[in-house]
């Protein structure tokens, strides 16, 4: 993309679409560089692009053409009802995780309907915070205390930024650092009604991992031992110490891990074990009661 002092946003959009091979990506990046939302951007198509906006857009196009994920280039992404900040300190939120969140919300609402006055929920390995913040924002206000944990201090900086941007800053959301349950105060054992996690679940030698994922996303959030099950082993083994009687565990799983995770849950005395599918019909969610 060459500099042109007289180029309009409409013309620049066409140039970017040709370079990227995607009109949708070009539009997102042009809107992001201009600082305009969709309707306002359409109204500004005949306006000349400022030098500052042109420089910013050229930098983003170069990063995208080098293979960097679009979400990191834009440093933002939509997840359910949230617009969140994302960068290479955290895993990119994916549509499959939205289905996991919905399963957790449905369970939480069912518990609230059964006259449970207030729920305590943990989002283990929160990353950008999208699971826990979605629960806090979509469940009735004041009904839920949500704990977000992560081993990575860098990831928690992103989660805190997303908490601040969510409008939930004065709500019952706690952000704590540590590995899985080690982040939580010991006095909270046997007090969580619901524990949710999207842990790393890719085997370190898995050849199917996309190049952009392996090159750009944090490996701590992706890989879990040779078979991808190490995080599940740890979480499932300890979850019973933290859940209340009849508490629920909800896990995002890899599409080929349903049987293995079911077996781990059964070995640790979980009941009502269910493996649910995502919108593509692949195993994606493990749900179980202690």
Predicted features and spans:
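Conserved SAM/SAH cofactor-binding pocket of Class I
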Residues: 99-208
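Conserved Class I SAM-dependent methyltransferase catalytic core
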Residues: 226-288
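Short conserved AdoMet
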Residues: 21, 140-141, 244
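Conserved AdoMet
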Residues: 28-107
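Mobile active-site "lid"/loop adjacent to the S-adenosyl-L-methionine
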Residues: 200-231
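Non-catalytic accessory regions of SAM-dependent methyltransferases
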Residues: 1-49
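Residue-level signal for inorganic ion chemistry
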Residues: 29, 67, 97, 131, ...
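Active-site beta-alpha loop architecture of Rossmann-like, nucleotide-cofactor-dependent enzymes
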Residues: 71, 202-205, 256
């Amino acid at each position: 993309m060459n500099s042109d002092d007289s180029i309009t946003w409409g013309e620049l959009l066409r140039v970017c679409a040709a370079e990227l091979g995607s009109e949708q990506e070009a539009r997102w990046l042009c809107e992001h560089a201009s600082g305009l939302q969709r309707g306002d951007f359409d109204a500004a198509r005949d306006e000349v692009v400022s030098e500052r906006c042109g420089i910013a857009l050229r930098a983003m196009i170069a990063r995208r053409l080098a293979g960097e994920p679009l979400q990191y280039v834009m440093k933002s992404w939509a997840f359910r009802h949230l617009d969140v900040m994302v960068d290479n300190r955290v895993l990119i939120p994916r549509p499959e995780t939205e289905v996991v969140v919905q399963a957790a919300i449905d369970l939480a609402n069912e518990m609230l309907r059964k006259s449970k006055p207030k729920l305590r929920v943990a989002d283990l390995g929160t990353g950008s915070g999208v699971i826990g913040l979605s629960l806090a924002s979509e469940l009735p206000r004041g009904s839920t205390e949500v704990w977000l944990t992560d081993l990575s201090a860098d990831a928690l900086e992103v989660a805190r930024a997303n908490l601040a941007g969510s409008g939930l800053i004065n709500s019952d959301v706690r952000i704590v650092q540590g590995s899985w349950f080690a982040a939580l105060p010991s006095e909270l054992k046997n007090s969580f009604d619901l524990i949710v996690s999207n842990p790393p679940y890719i085997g370190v030698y898995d050849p199917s991992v996309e190049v952009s994922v392996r090159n750009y996303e944090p490996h701590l959030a992706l890989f879990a031992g040779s078979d991808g099950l190490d995080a599940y082993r740890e979480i499932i083994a300890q979850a019973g110490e933290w859940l209340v009687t009849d508490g629920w565990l909800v896990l995002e799983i890899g599409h080929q891990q349903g049987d293995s995770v079911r077996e781990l849950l059964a070995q640790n005395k979980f009941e009502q074990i269910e493996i649910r599918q995502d919108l593509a019909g692949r195993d994606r969610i493990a749900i179980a009661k202690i």
